[in-house]
Regions:
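Domain-scale signature associated with acetyltransferase and cell-envelope carbohydrate enzymes
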Residues: 1-78, 101-103, 120, 136, ...
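Glycine-rich, phosphate-binding/catalytic loops in enzymes
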Residues: 94, 140, 156-158
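Beta-rich strand-turn-strand
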Residues: 56-60, 109-122, 128-132
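Short-chain dehydrogenase/reductase
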Residues: 105, 123, 139-141
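Glycine-rich NAD(P)-binding loop of Rossmann-like domains
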Residues: 38, 90-100
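Conserved catalytic-core motifs of eukaryotic protein kinase domains, centered on the activation segment
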Residues: 81-82, 88-90, 150-151
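A short, glycine- and basic residue-enriched loop/turn
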Residues: 98, 115-116, 137
């Protein structure tokens, strides 16, 4: 990631430890706080979150995102209309805070609109448009988003926070993956790839 592929406009914007932001030149991550009222407007993103390419979060009053929340490519979260319904000259329009609970997963290109609260562990399906509160421990999908399934409360839930909590264990996992991916590599194979590369090298 290059810093210029992440745009932060306005403030305050608070991002917790171990949050990963993935951005590309064609799919920038945009975090915007823009309020017309003095002292209003803030964005809080918890620890261990994941923001994938193209994520946009736009706050006119308040957006609070809990720990271990994952936002897939192109997800959009906003707490404002950004223009008045009848007075289009209003630059922000009506704003109502958005609160997203711990360990929520927001799917590809999903939209979360003003005034919404999403309960912990819930999953928002790809392309969903969330216009009403979503309870905890459910899967919601569609436009407007509706609950399509409840998660099993008896099954243990592992979060990004759990995964990132032990750096030594995490490093060992990555080392194991690297070794598995390179197990068929040989010195002669490397030399051949330099002299006579073939597709798949």
């Amino acid at each position: 990631m290059k810093p210029w592929d992440v745009e932060v406009f306005g403030g305050p914007v608070s991002i917790g430890a171990c949050t990963h932001v993935i951005a590309t030149p064609d799919k920038r991550v945009r975090l915007t706080v823009w309020s017309t009222l003095e002292g209003r407007g803030r964005m809080v993103i918890g620890k261990y979150c994941l923001l994938c390419p193209g994520v946009r979060i736009s706050a006119g009053c308040e957006i609070v995102i809990g720990d271990s929340v994952m936002m897939a490519q192109g997800a959009f979260i906003t707490d404002s209309d950004w223009h008045g319904v009848y007075d289009r000259s209003l630059s922000v329009g009506e704003s109502i805070p958005v609160h997203i609970g711990r360990n929520v997963w927001i799917g590809d290109s999903a939209i979360v609109t003003k005034g919404v609260a999403i309960g912990e562990n819930s999953i928002i399906g790809a392309g969903a448009v969330v216009v009403r509160d979503i309870p905890p421990n459910v899967i919601a999908a569609g436009n407007p988003a509706a609950v399509v399934r409840e998660l099993d409360p008896d099954r243990p839930m592992k979060t990004r926070g759990d995964w990132l909590a032990d750096p030594k264990e995490l490093a060992a996992q990555f080392e194991e993956i690297d070794l598995d991916r390179m197990k068929n590599n040989t010195w002669l194979g490397w030399l051949r790839s330099l002299i006579h590369p073939v597709k798949g090298d």
